[in-house]
């Protein structure tokens, strides 16, 4: 079996950064056939003065391209799920800390998916993901409670102001009960 050995980097991982970057750009462009990618990358390897052993084989490039495509597919799925979650949350408040924790959980999920793709028999640290998501849920719940409490305080303050204005205006010449009620409604945000 041609399995990656633990701790051993692939040929692509050992390539210079500029060659790897070019490879990734070419793989993203679906119009470029793998045969041409192989030719150009091997030419870049040769131009860089690297030994012939560093050149990519057709099957090695295909394996790497398949891996990259699988990762891309998983990322697209994750983005769709994130978009759906964001749409579901709507305009509910979400603090920066919550966003950060969700991003960290997303990152950990991505890393776990990558490990699973590279080695299907490996264990995924579900506890870490579960704890991160639980922390995000608790943080979101706290943020919602805080938002609700802040709203209640604002409402109480508005009622207090409306009562004070109503008492001040009550009995004033030229102020009808209807006008007084309209002013009160404006202060309470009901107008």
UniProtKB/Swiss-Prot annotation:
It is found in: Host cytoplasm. Pfam families: Phage_Mu_Gp27. GO terms for cellular component: host cell cytoplasm. GO terms for molecular function: DNA binding. Induction: Expressed in the late phase of the viral replicative cycle. Expression of late genes is activated by the viral late transcription activator C. Keywords: DNA-binding, Host cytoplasm, Late protein, Viral genome excision, Viral genome packaging, Viral release from host cell. GO terms for biological process: provirus excision. Coiled coil: none annotated. Its main location: host cell. Heterodimer with the terminase large subunit gp28; the active complex is probably heterooligomeric. The terminase small subunit binds to the packaging initiation site (pac) and regulates the ATPase activity of the terminase large subunit. The terminase lies at a unique vertex of the procapsid and is composed of two subunits, a small terminase subunit involved in viral DNA recognition (packaging sequence), and a large terminase subunit possessing endonucleolytic and ATPase activities. Both terminase subunits heterooligomerize and are docked on the portal protein to form the packaging machine. Belongs to the mulikevirus small terminase family. This is Probable terminase, small subunit gp27. The lineage of its organism: Viruses, Duplodnaviria, Heunggongvirae, Uroviricota, Caudoviricetes.
């Amino acid at each position: 079996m041609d399995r990656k050995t633990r701790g051993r980097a692939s040929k692509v991982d050992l390539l210079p950064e500029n060659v790897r970057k070019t490879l990734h750009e070419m793989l993203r462009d679906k119009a470029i056939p793998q045969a041409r990618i192989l030719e150009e990358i091997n030419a870049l390897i040769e131009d860089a003065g690297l030994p012939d052993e560093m050149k990519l084989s057709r099957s090695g490039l295909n394996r790497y391209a398949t891996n990259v495509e699988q990762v891309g597919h998983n990322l697209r799925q994750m983005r769709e799920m994130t978009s759906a979650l964001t749409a579901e949350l709507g305009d509910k408040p979400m603090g920066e800390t919550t966003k950060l924790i969700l991003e960290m959980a997303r990152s950990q999920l991505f890393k776990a998916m990558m490990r699973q793709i590279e080695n299907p028999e490996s264990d995924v640290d579900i506890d870490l993901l579960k704890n991160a998501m639980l922390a995000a849920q608790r943080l979101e719940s706290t943020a919602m409670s805080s938002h609700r409490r802040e709203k209640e305080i604002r409402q109480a303050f508005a009622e207090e102001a409306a009562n004070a204005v109503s008492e001040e205006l009550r009995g004033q010449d030229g102020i009808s009960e209807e006008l007084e009620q309209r002013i009160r409604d404006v202060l309470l945000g009901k107008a």
